[in-house]
Curated annotation (Swiss-Prot):
Associates with the EF-Tu.GDP complex and induces the exchange of GDP to GTP. It remains bound to the aminoacyl-tRNA.EF-Tu.GTP complex up to the GTP hydrolysis stage on the ribosome. InterPro entries: EF-Ts_dimer_sf, Transl_elong_EFTs/EF1B, Transl_elong_EFTs/EF1B_dimer, Transl_elong_Ts_CS, UBA-like_sf. Residues 1-14 form a transit peptide. GO terms for cellular component: mitochondrion. This is Elongation factor Ts, mitochondrial. Belongs to the EF-Ts family. One of its GO terms (molecular function) is translation elongation factor activity. The keyword Transit peptide applies. GO terms for biological process: mitochondrial translational elongation. It is found in: Mitochondrion. CDD domains: UBA_EF-Ts.
């Protein structure tokens, strides 16, 4: 049987058209475009995955699409985490957040400085820090000084939607493409009459969560006998602890009665009449109460604080990757 070339061409053309039409993806409608834009804004996931979610659930069911995306992101994150788990995480951020007599300190590590400065990474740090502080609401208070507790990071949940922090981190691994480890999740509890203040340097983060390479927490009690705001006093002391590298709280320096005449040359008689109290400050001092106050070096920290009618109960200082063992969720 002889088939003409024209018939063959017609058959091939029809087959080719059917094949192409089967593989062509329809362009999104106006409502789908808006839904796609909204989905990307809410989740930050790729165009491809958001498109798949909309194809699965439609533009009118964004909540289900978001759930699907988060589940898929965690699954992809665990796969990527398994591949990246051996990579060292030497960069990152330390954060602090305070609420009354409680404070949360978190250290989240990543591979590069580039990712540590990423806004997505900082949002992750903020979510984890809030989760740690939220856990403090269930852990009571201290009866004396500071009580430092390590949170159970495997059961830690976010305060907003109850999502496990380890799943939140795994999701970020898939999104950012780097190994991420939570090496510190600490609670500081103080007595009910103590107010905690926090600070981070260099100062980053948000209005409520301070982030940086160094963090400090100072606990104050007592009412001001001046108009100087307690919040400002606490902030100044936190700055001092970071900058002056205080190691212990210590005790106040003894104030000695001394004759100025004994401390000057015999030719200098101008101060010979003075016989008062002088505090001798050691510039190498590491006890907080005995250190020269950073913003007013003529006074010790103890003198400055008591001058405002307050007292320091305790303090805490730490920095990125100091005295903690890195713990990864990847196995």
């Amino acid at each position: 049987m002889i088939v003409s070339r024209q018939v063959i061409r017609s058959v091939v053309r029809k087959s080719f058209n059917r094949l192409c039409s089967a593989n062509v993806v329809a362009l999104p409608s106006g409502s789908t475009k808006e839904a796609l834009k909204e989905l990307r804004r809410k989740t930050g996931y790729s165009y491809v995955n958001c498109r798949k979610a909309l194809n699965e659930f439609g533009p009118d069911n964004l909540d289900e699409a978001i759930k699907w995306l988060k589940k898929r992101a965690i699954e992809e994150g665990w796969e990527k985490a398994a591949k990246l788990g051996d990579r060292p995480t030497r960069q990152g951020i330390v954060s602090v957040m305070t609420k009354g007599n409680k404070a949360a300190i978190v250290e989240l590590n990543c591979e590069t400085d580039f990712v540590s400065r990423n806004e997505d990474f900082k949002r992750l740090v903020e979510d984890v820090t809030k989760a740690v502080l939220h856990a403090a609401d269930r852990d009571g208070t201290s009866t004396h000084g500071f009580e430092l507790l390590n949170s159970n990071i495997n059961s830690l949940k976010t305060s907003e939607n109850g999502m496990l922090v380890k799943d939140l981190i795994t999701e970020a691994i898939g999104r950012l493409g780097e190994n991420i480890t939570l090496s510190r999740a600490q609670l500081i509890l103080a007595p009910p009459n103590v107010q905690l203040f926090g600070y981070a340097h260099p100062k980053e983060g948000t209005d409520r969560v301070y982030m940086g390479r160094y963090v400090s927490v100072v606990g104050l009690k007592g009412s001001n006998k001046t108009d100087f705001p307690t919040e400002k006093l606490g902030f100044q002391l936190c700055q001092h602890v970071v900058g002056m590298r205080s190691l212990t709280l210590g005790t106040p320096l003894p104030v000695k009665k001394t004759s100025v005449k004994d401390e000057v040359s015999q030719d200098d008689e101008i101060n010979a009449f003075y016989n008062g109290e002088v505090t001798h400050i050691d510039e190498n001092e590491t006890q907080l109460l005995r250190q020269s106050f950073m913003l007013n070096p003529s006074q010790t920290v103890h003198e400055y604080v008591t001058g405002h009618g307050a007292s320091i109960v305790d303090f805490y200082r730490t920095e990125l990757s100091s005295n903690v063992s890195e713990e990864s969720f990847q196995s």
